[in-house]
Each structure stands twice: as structure tokens, then as C-alpha cells.
Amino acid sequence: MLPLLAALLAAACPLPPARGGAVDAPGLLGAPLNASVNASSSDEPAAPRLLASAAPGAPERPEEEAAAPCNISVQRQMLSSLLVRWGRPRGFQCDLLLFSTNAHGRAFFAAAFHRVGPPLLIEHLGLAAGGAQQDLRLCVGCGWVRGRRPGRLRPTGATAGAPTALPAYPAAEPPGPLWLQGEPLHFCCLDFSLEELQGEPGWRLNRKPIESTLVACFMTLVIVVWSVAALIWPVPIIAGFLPNGMEQRRTTASAAAAAPAAVPAGTTAAAAAAAAAAAAAAAVTSGTATK
């Protein structure tokens, strides 16, 4: 009885096929694995899968700025120093190269300055021996990025609440050479000769340091003082060797002062009488005072 009932039930209610069951009845087995991805792709834009495509490219500078005219001026300050100026529109951080070009492929003098700004004073400039003509080339390269730190860029599209079902970003590749990590610089070069700079307003061929000037002034003062002293000190010595005229005048003056005053010849008797009267009066006065 039971086998017959089972056969009747099997004939009346056939079982669903083994293949394609998930397609015919999606509610029984649940959504497929890629359902969330497909749904997000239909409603929202696809999430970035590569770091390069997600990161926004750096805005490229127009060609006018890259091909800007060289606004570089060189001024000679002293015999072995140069003052270099260039325009600020070329960038914030600049690298400067200076080297000689008339040595048949070998630089007689070369100097490099990293991250400098105008104006720049270059001292201890190497000069060619024998006063030969020296041609130099000055190159300035500037960038527009200040203090960029090396590291992996973060995509702007990724947020803190991003779903975990998104594919992970690939690991950052090891950094390449140093000259490939930074921003490309556009160098602007200027060729000049040292002999051409002698007519500049700041050129001082015979300019000396302050120490030499002070020493020269001191030695000049010493020479003047010694010259005046050499003219003055022999005067009293020479006067000591010529005492005849001065002593004769001194002797005559002392004799005239010591001699008594001369009395005229006609007044001798009167003067004697006056002197006797004065002596008598003095004697009387002294006697009266004694009593």
C-alpha cells in the first residue's frame, strides 16, 4: 500500500530539475554572490580598482609656463663673486647650476645650489689662470610644490564608510630612483662671459675688504704724526746751541735794572739839603717816641 502511495505522489508532483534551480527559484536559494556588485554597478558608478585610476592626476601646467622666457640677471660684485636674480613666477623652490663651458667638454669650474631663492650670492668663483676669457652657463630650474613628502597617494573617492566588499588596493610599489620621484623641473639657462660683466654698475675691480682699508688709514695717520714730530723736536735742541744773542740781551736787561737812577747835575745841592732835612726829622721823631 505504501509503495503505491509513493508512486502516485511522485507522478502527481514532479521534483524541480537539478540544474537551473537557482535561476527558476531565486527566492529559495538566496541571491547570487555577485548580486551586490551588479546592483551597485547599476545604481552607482563602479568603484576604482586601481590606485592610478582612482587618484586624480596632478594638474599639468600650461605650456606657456613651461616655455616661459628666461628672466635671469647676473651681476658681478667683486673679483670672485656673482649676484644672481631671477623671476619669482618660475616657481618656489629652485635649483641652480653654474659651470664653465670653454674647456672642451670639461668644466673648469662647477657649482650647484639646491632649493634656493633670489637673490643668490655666489662667492669664491673659480677664475681661469692667466686672465683668459672664461665663459659660463647658468641654469635655474624651479618647481611649484613646497615640501612634498614621499608616500602613497590616497584616492579621493574612498571614504571611511566604504563597503568591505570592494576589492582591496594593490600594495604600493617600492620607490624608484630619486630623480623619478620628484616633480620635473624646467631649467632655463643663460650663457655669459665674465669679461662682459665688467661694465655692470656693481662691478668693483679694486674693491678691498674693510680690514685693508682700516690698516691703510692707520698707517697714514702714523706717518703724518711722525712727520710733524720730526719737524718740531729739533727746534729746542738747535736753540740750545745758539745761546749768544739771547744771553747778551738777558745780561743787558739785568744790569739796567740793578743800576741806581741817574741824578741831573743841576739838582745836586738841593737834593743833598732835602736829604739832610729828612734825616733830622727822622731823628727828632725817634727821640720823641723814646721818651
Curated annotation (Swiss-Prot):
This is Transmembrane protein 158. The gene is TMEM158. It is a multi-pass membrane protein. It comes from the Eukaryota. It comes from Bos taurus. The keyword Transmembrane applies. Its main location: membrane. GO terms for molecular function: peptide binding. InterPro entries: TMEM158. Residues 1-20 form the signal peptide. Glycans are attached at residue 71.
